[in-house]
UniProtKB/Swiss-Prot annotation:
EC number, UniProt record: 2.5.1.19
Function comment: Catalyzes the transfer of the enolpyruvyl moiety of phosphoenolpyruvate (PEP) to the 5-hydroxyl of shikimate-3-phosphate (S3P) to produce enolpyruvyl shikimate-3-phosphate and inorganic phosphate.
UniProt name for this protein: 3-phosphoshikimate 1-carboxyvinyltransferase
Similarity field: Belongs to the EPSP synthase family.
GO terms classed as biological process: amino acid biosynthetic process; aromatic amino acid family biosynthetic process; chorismate biosynthetic process
Name of one Pfam family that matches: EPSP_synthase
Quaternary organization: Monomer.
Residues the record lists as binding phosphoenolpyruvate: K21, G93, R121, Q167, R344, R386
Residues annotated as binding 3-phosphoshikimate: K21, S22, R26, S165, Q167, D313, K340
One GO CC annotation: cytoplasm
Catalytic activity field: 3-phosphoshikimate + phosphoenolpyruvate = 5-O-(1-carboxyvinyl)-3-phosphoshikimate + phosphate
Amino acid sequence: MDKRISPAAAITGAITLPGDKSISHRYAMISSIAEGDSRILNYSTGADCHSTLGCMRALGIEITGEGTEFVVHGKGLDGLRAPAGDLDAGNSGSTIRMLSGILAAQPFTTRIFGDESLSRRPMQRIMKPLAQMGAEIRAREEKFPPLEIHGGKLRAIDYTLPVPSAQVKTCVLFAGLFAEGETTVTEPVRSRDHTEIALREFGAELTAAKGKITLTGRPRLTGRDLIVPSDISSAAFFIVAALLVRGSSLVIRGVGLNPSRSALLDLLIGMGAKIRIPQLESQNGELIGEIQVEHSALQGGVIEGGLTAAVIDEIPVLAVLGAATEEGLTIKDAGELRVKETDRIATVVENLRRLGVTAEETPDGLVIPGRQKFRAAEFDSFGDHRIAMAFAVAALRGDGESVIQNADAASVSFPEFWSTLERIAE
């Protein structure tokens, strides 16, 4: 599907976005191995999160409901059953990486696969710690999906992440739930901590301090009533749209503002963005609030180190924004983007050039000069949801009608993206 986007006169209105993708995955998985029912409201509508539901159902978990409301009938740590066939993770790296930690502890063998894009994404980062815990995992070419996971009794380990990754951290912690003793994960740079918050919410004994997370194995997890905050990564596209287009004033309600994710807002405010958060509330251990944003002239800057890790999913749309700043934007330490749904460094640069923007690709990032004009163009999502949405935002500031090729890629995380954009773009 191709989508035509006209320049916007302004981005205005008040919107509520679908549930956070990262939190939805975690709630579905933990609810399945908790005892009793968990009611999940505002579950993500994205295809990735429904891949997780499909996998849990295949493992014998009854999940009722539809749309954004589900009840997961948990069976406890030892309640999963061997699936009748292979598990399908679709396009979801979160599903295959995090769920593998649970599968590694099961008394049966599981084969889990994904689509063509996921089949190109390396899995050594989860295979190594799980092997140390006692699991046997076979992979295509020793690193790519499908994975064949021979589960069994696991041992607790003390593991240091070689690079920051919330998915790998979660995989090890999920495996640690089934091991006797304490499993410790040390991360070089703080990554999003939704897993730690959710595990505590379900009753796990877990401590986190100075980059070290320690989990006591074999806890009794208890089902909960849960509300998923709106996804800040989805909000990022509309925040950037409002910042880019003159005369814009936008309100986004009920957004998850976990400090490990809100670095995006701190970055933008530091660049001069007119962003307000009138009040914060706590919901299932997660902070939520309303974001108010207006068109702003931004200075630009450098994204590197821990900041890069904190905004890794938002870098495609931040790259678009960088071209409109006064000083431009330099992004470093983002090599992880090379192994996302696409090589996001290459696909961002390719589409920026179509936009008429000068951009330089580096081994682990991008250099984007500022004060550049956007022209109408035909953009290609290359099947990557974040690329599709980032360049739809770019098109709002173009000098004519643009086309997003393969626009349906957005449905992986945000099926309502196009209708929401039409509602707020004047």
